[in-house]
Amino acid sequence: MSVYHLPTLLNPLVNAIFNCPEPERSPLKKLFANLKTRRFILLAPPSEYLLNYHDVKSKLPLHDLCYNAEFINSYILLMTENSYINTNSRDSHYETLDGKTVVIQWKNNVIHALNGFHIRRRLKILETKILPNFNDYFEGAADFIILFIDQPLNCEFVPNDYLQCFHNYEKIPKNAHAMPNLSIDSFQQERSSFENILHIHPARLTQLGQLFSSYRTLAPGDDPSRSIFESIVQQAFDGMKSDSLFKNFSNLYDLIHDYFELNLYDDIWSRLTTHFKGHEVDTEKYKYFSVNQLLTDFYSKDYGEFELHDITLIERRLHLASKHLQKLALTHSYAEKSKILVETLQKLSGTTEMDSHQLELPDGLNNMTMDADTLISLFVLVVCRSEQKHLKSHLYYLQNFSNNSSSTKFGILGYAVSTLEAVVCYFEDFNKNTGNVAKANTLCEKTKNLLDKLSCENPTNEVEDLATYKDILTYRNEQGQSILSICITNHKNYILLDILSEYETDFPVEDLLEDETIDGSTLLIESIKAGNLEAAKVLIKIMLFNCTEEELVSYINKTDKYARTVAHYLTHEMDILKSIGNYIDWKRKNSSGQTPLFSIFRSYDQPNYEEMVKTAFDIANTWYRKHNSLFDYLDHTDNKGNSLLHVLKTNIPILLQLTKLDINEENYKGLTPLMVYVKYKRLSNIDAITKDRRLILEKVQNSTFFTCFDYAKDHSVLSKIGERGVKDSLFGLIYFHSLRYHNLNATTNITSVSNAEKPFATTVINMKTIQGLLRSILKDNPFTFLPLNTYIDEISHLNRSDLTIIGKTDVTSLLHQLTNCFNVLLFLKKIPENLFTDEASILYWMRINTSKRNQKPSGKENPKTMEPEEINMIQSFLRFNFDEISSFKASLNILRKVLIFINLKSDDFEDAYKGLNEMGRKLINSEASSAFKGIITNHNMFSELSLAELLENVRFLEQCTIQLSSFVQIILFEKIPNWWKHYGEFLALHKSYRKAFPNMVKPKSASDTSSRAPLGGFIETKREQSEQRLAVQIKASSKMLKELGSEIFVAHERLAEELSNYMEFRKACLDQRSLVAFATTNISVLQECV
């Protein structure tokens, strides 16, 4: 076996198995011998783990263990016939080289390490790669499957010591769940211990149960009887404090109080609600309270001091607080009620961290302060909007059922309870309906009346005199909508215009700019969302006339709670887009990662889609140029990895004109734009993108190994993408694709060049017909350099349905080989050009061809006598060609390995760069860590498309060269030496004959002897018998020479013809279709990188 040295691969496990320079001297030589003719799958952990971690048990680095056969065996999955078939359970069972069991769920990309593994793990498949075999010691397959998994298996691993300079380097695998390290305070621990002791001692539980019954018996049905509750708690405390079981509890009284509260809460609460029945606060009639009615101090500020921005921030606080106060109805203890009350006030005042919604609010919300009166007024609104029932009952509970009476009088809780008490008094004053309260009630009624008119579609219930509602025009509802916003959403545009024109001083432009709902929707956003284009145009006209460019940019790019600007809501509003397009931040993304341009591109239900898309793209392009940059396609990728090409329904030429555009980019599901177009039958897009030279037609979806052909269910779609396949094929003549199974019979779609009306034709042909066609061609061309026997055998195995990834890779490989094979046959005119118009044409041609072949005379009837000079000429011709072919074959072998390694090392470079960046960011030294951010790389020295095409052509050419070389080798080193051997024997026989019978001109035949002497068989002499025996041997030797010579002559003629065909094919394949195409594509790639 030859020794070769190729670059070391980054992943130690992949390198150890596939890239051994001297396998016969390797410590893994037995493993290599075992796997020599077998197919297998390799599970490969990330390089980061193998290079930077070590095994806990053996203390050895994982990269050293990669050269240990015992370690490697668990990562090698042996393939059987069942490996190609999906079972109904969709799980594939595999056995490792050392007999362990692994189950792969292909659909979920999950691997389960089961029987035999001392650590059972659930592994995630990060990536599936097909590794072309480049070594000389594995003969079982031309390609091997590598499943990259998220962590090593069958060992415990920890980071190496040198990683201590990195901060928190250890990573938890994605499929592992870290157990949170929760700190439990001492009181919670004591409560748990207290309850455990009670459950262990039933006598104590019985005593407490009697006290519970005592409360239920003694307390009246409409009186919560605080004194009775405190009495039984004290009684229990007196009985327990001297008990040795409870002597270690530092908070025994609190524990007993909470335990009694837990068991008696329902009884206490039912008595409370009964007690306050008919006297509770009814917030229903105050639902129209607004900020403008309660925060009069804000609205009475001078024009220069008042900012509507403050009101919108308060509205958001009110919304958060109202939502939180609604939880009060779910509480069942003093602690829970007090916690909700305090947190509600904190959210209202902005004095503490709020929930996740607040994190999206402007910073000013947390910095705004307010006095006690303002807080009470706002809390009134909170109570109204939360629709809180039993408010007095909650207040009474908080005031009377604390385990520490001072907590409700002092501190933050005391302040909260006092505020709640003030709010209750506030509502009681409202019920008296006197003085200012009466005025407020009147305003509520007037507000209700106006809102009813604004929301009513009955023309008889319209607003007749807007002036009568002047004092409530500053109203804002619980969603933060102003009267303007309510008019917009209800399409009351005539009222909107009246307000904007008649009450301009009450609604200045500054307030229009700051008017937002609690979810951040501006008036313009509300207009677009409501489909009120007339209102939108009015607002835009006002803004354009009164605002500076800076104000316009700020306003138009304001975002709502979904991080959407007004541009994200534009779908078919062409005029609005044109009027505000130059002020839109086209790079601004919403919470889904979608830019305004992305949102417009995916709004498919608009009537003028193409025009809208073109206009939006042109405006965005202009915006980029205005900001001194070129349109950046990568700015518009969403959180799912979808690009503009993925979502564009039609008119993709506007994007294909971009130079720095990856038209083969995958989203996070592994779908390319072409796959999406094929899946949803977007024919115009398919037509445009298949004409782009940058397209990789057979890009594979990593998770399923589907290509675009697997998503094609329509014949017109298959034909369209098949045409591109033909153009990309070796000689642009034919393309095999889309293998399908029907009742275990495999069929394939074939697109080929046609002489009919259409330039291309796509037909469905049974694979058995293709197999028969190959057999017929092989009979006509027994010395063909095409490996037809290999293809015939592989087609015989296509009787499996529901192929797994493994089967799909084999099918894809076979279809590629058949495409190349028939391209060559058509190129050399071995078969007619219109053969694949339909299956009947193929069958007819095969019958005609068989008939012609049977009519040809056999060469064995008239064997040709070959002279030594002729044999020498043939031998010299074949030796010269054999040397040339062998030299070329060696060059192809080197070129194939170089191409494979260009791709492998490019991936290694990318992985190493990512690992370096990740480690650099974890450096403890911040200056050193920041230095890694400036690293720039460019590993795309070659186009993925051009490399794949060139490698496929080189591999095919190498197969053909090996096939032809084997035929030449047989003739040159077997047939011709055999002829020379028999020729020497023939000469020796002649020499013996002349020496023994010098007077004989030529050897006599048996017939001559018998005619001369009828009874010669009995009387012939010993000399005559010897002469006859030599004559027979000479005749047999002469016949053998003629047969061998004739066989060599025919083989030589056919080989000479095949060599000529091969040279023609080789030149066209390597020079024109491979190297030139490779160079052209890469020049284009490098130009795009400049």
UniProtKB/Swiss-Prot annotation:
Pfam families: VPS9 (PF02204). It comes from the Eukaryota. Transmembrane segments: none annotated. One of its GO terms (molecular function) is SNARE binding. One of its GO terms (cellular component) is transport vesicle. SUPFAM superfamilies: Pseudo ankyrin repeat-like, VPS9 domain. InterPro entries: Ankyrin_rpt-contain_sf, UPF0507/Ank_repeat_27, VPS9, VPS9_dom_sf. Residues 289-436 form the VPS9 domain. PROSITE patterns: VPS9. Signal peptide: none annotated. One of its GO terms (biological process) is early endosome to late endosome transport. Belongs to the UPF0507 family. This is UPF0507 protein SCRG_01893.
